[in-house]
Design a protein with these regions (language model features):
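NTP-dependent nucleotidyl-transfer catalytic core
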Residues: 1-219
Length: 219
């Protein structure tokens, strides 16, 4: 019987000199790692191994959900019902607890949503307190995520989240204004896509906050 060298089994050279970028796992910061994240993590890591075996240089990217109005909600929740001691002791579980509490209370008091939007605007404007709390939540989450990745025996080359683009939106807005593409609609700023029979592209919300955009970075 012929012996198969398992170390080289399935290896190839068709990928030499080529690069493949794989974006996978991508959990939402301050929320528990669930089965959906596990599925994409396993699939992504399997693709990484296959491409690597074929000679490709593979960049493993974990694009975290680490920016958005939900962090304004979490900051409000932390200030109203949380404590530093509880978060440090219970980590993501405590963050999830107060986040759920926020939504329960917001059903009875809509002003909480206004406060959340205000805190997110502060984050976008570089407010030191807002960003410090957000970074703390993110760091706590990464400790838990990396623990899980270690159990699975995998790593990433880049932990690049939505927040990576937070200082790049202003340039996108300026370029759209220069080209007269930015239109005000119900207090928000959009790019109309009517000629393509598509819904408008939201650029700036009416509260002054933005959506993240990687257009300039990828181009």
């Amino acid at each position: 019987m012929k012996t198969v060298d398992t170390a080289d089994f399935g290896a190839g050279t068709e990928g030499e000199g080529k690069t493949v970028c794989i974006d996978y796992s991508s959990p939402n910061v301050a929320k528990n790692f669930h089965v959906g994240h596990l599925r994409t993590t396993i699939i992504g890591n399997s693709l990484y191994k296959i491409y690597s075996k074929l000679g490709y240089h593979v960049e493993r990217i974990n694009h975290l959900g680490d920016w958005g109005t939900q962090f304004g909600k979490l900051i409000v929740a932390y200030k109203k019902w949380g404590s530093k001691e509880a978060v440090e002791k219970n980590g993501i579980d405590e963050l999830m607890k107060i986040y759920v509490k926020f939504h329960q209370e917001a059903e009875k008091d809509d002003s909480l949503n206004d406060q959340a939007r205000e805190w997110f605007v502060k984050m976008e404007q570089g407010d030191e307190e807002a960003l410090a709390i957000w970074q703390w939540f993110k760091d706590i989450s990464l400790v838990e995520y990396k623990r899980i990745y270690k159990l699975l025996g995998m790593d990433f080359d880049h932990f690049t989240g939505e927040s990576f683009y937070r200082d790049k939106t202003h340039e996108v807005v300026e370029k759209l204004q220069e080209k007269d593409l930015l239109v005000e609609s119900e207090g928000a700023h959009i790019v109309s896509l009517d000629e393509y029979d598509m819904a408008p592209c939201l650029i700036m919300k009416k509260d002054g906050s933005s959506i993240y955009a990687c257009l300039l970075y990828t181009s």
